Amino acid sequence: MAVMRRTESAAASIFTQALFKKFKTYAPPARTIGVMATDTAFAADLTAQLRAQVQQALAAGTRLRLRGGGSKDFYGETLNGALLDMRGHHGVVSYEPSELVVTVRAGTPLTELEALLASQGQCLAFEPPHFGPGATVGGMVASGLSGPARASVGALRDFILGVKIINGRGEALTFGGQVMKNVAGYDVSRLMAGSLGTLGVLLEVSLKVLPVAPAEATLWLAGVGQQQALDLLNRWGGQALPLNASCWVHDSAEQPPRDALFVRLRGAVAAVEAACPRLTADAVALGAQVQRMDEPQAGADWTACREQTLPFFKAPPSALQALHTDLGLWRLSVPQTTPALALPAVVSSPLIEWHGGLRWVWAPASAAALLRNAAQKAGGHATLFRASPSRGEADKAGGVFTPLTPVQQGIQRELQKQFDPAGIFATGRQGAA
């Protein structure tokens, strides 16, 4: 995902000049706050070695491709450059549950971080997808992806308080901090979210964490059509309801197949219990059948949604497979209030998340322009998230991401020039700026 989709700035020169006045040389902290995630014997700070590798690459003119567990290798334009494996640089630097902040090295397995937080009744509220057992914290930040709760709690970038990186000159730098009220360097830290390793080596990240909600309920609304679901979600979004996540899909696993909307509520016990009958009444008025799911099954289904192991994500519809060999999974990000998109017959029925803001479809590479036009008309953009396994790079030739505007291209070039003047991280993962 292009860096420019992660920033609110509109003026390249003023923006980048202001950013780099805030640079500081990074010295790894010697202190530990609160609870350590792992025994220090299993933690490793490879800052010095990583700096040396970057400096060697700079001297040799070698481009570097940063990699953790490789769980998101499918994402982005290309995988060029000499591999710089980040898994050895791992461990939790500090964790203070009472302050709701954790600082962790990039190579730390995401499962380990989540287990530590769970032991203290806390979590990463944006529900980052793993897409594989080897997922690391660095890959989580670099991909910039958020899970089902994103529309209600915010995106990954909203939870980044500070980062420590190695830039293209081999310098270790720090931005932001470990407190939520920190201002200096805040936007620079967030630029790392979704940068796909093209701005520098992420050493550490400080993240805001949240307590696990005391109550949760998932409602299964069967027989709710796509536009009906969008209308309901828009109506509920304007009310004081603990709406946390939603997923609408044409459920082909049911016999006969039918439309279904899944809604997750999270919050105080009283709020969740009061909301369930209200949502049920609204859905029943439309002729839907409503069932409150068992918590273990609901939890497994939301995990499957996050990790894209639901039937929808496993394979394109058989009717489309019979006609096309270049079917890929497309990600359409649009305003939540966007009505059902009018898409051609070569595009599958969508799976809709984020209360209408995220729409997944299967479509052939030849439909790229149609999808991008539909998303842009709605005020959003379309991304080829997973290319056809049989065609891979061939289907990415038309571009994975929606092309940037000239202004956005200018800002991105300036950012890359400041972070990485020699272009050793310019692997083409985000396409040409």
Map each language-model feature to its residues.
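Low-acidity, Ser/Thr- and Arg-rich intrinsically disordered low-complexity segments
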Residues: 5-9, 13
